[in-house]
Regions:
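Residues forming the flavin
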Residues: 1-184
Length: 184
């Protein structure tokens, strides 16, 4: 609550965002990250343990290009329209309009086509997630909502392999949590 989206980039020519708020949490708006599941099938290209890192970097490079080095933003209504135009969705869905508002961002931003950042399968999953959230929080998927991205660092892009009892190839080591690639 009362938060902002900030540029959290750590590499030249790439852009990642993250949400933050001051301790008082008294800003005018709130923000939330809508996360989609990404599996190796979404990004396997080189068949190396670092494929997830390469994919993350590709998304961040796409975001950097989309916003010309600034945080790329787009109204949800336009995002949906672009997905329909590209055949990713059959029809647009966005909730009843809420009162328009300014994006709660810190740093420079630029309006852009966010559908160019992720592959079609992830854009579709994102839109489905927004629709599902709107069933729980009315207005969540309003066409007036500002999207910005990409928040690509919610979990490690490298997953440590585990066996059937969740142990790594080193006896007694049980990888878990975000750092091991097992968020959620």
């Amino acid at each position: 609550p009362g938060g902002y989206v900030v540029n959290a980039s750590s590499e030249e020519g790439r852009l990642a965002v993250n949400g933050m708020s001051y301790s008082d949490r008294d800003g005018d708006c709130a923000n939330s990250a809508v996360i989609v599941s990404v599996s190796p099938e979404d990004y396997k290209t080189r068949d190396t343990p670092l494929d997830g890192v390469f994919f993350q970097r590709e998304l961040e490079q796409n975001a950097y290009r989309a916003g010309n080095g600034k945080i790329p933003i787009q109204k949800y209504r336009e995002f949906q329209k672009n997905l329909v135009d590209r055949g990713v969705l059959e029809k647009a869905f966005y909730a009843e309009a809420i009162e328009p508002f300014s994006p709660a961002l810190m740093g420079q931003y630029e309006q852009a086509d966010l559908t160019d950042i992720m592959p079609a399968s992830l854009n579709r999953a994102f839109a489905e997630g927004m629709e599902e959230m709107n069933r729980k929080i009315r207005g969540f998927a309003s066409g007036e909502v500002w999207l910005c991205g990409v928040e690509s660092r919610t979990s490690s892009p490298i997953r440590i392999d585990r066996d059937d009892v969740l142990q790594s190839n080193i006896e007694g080591i049980y990888p878990c949590g975000e750092g091991a690639g097992y968020a959620g």
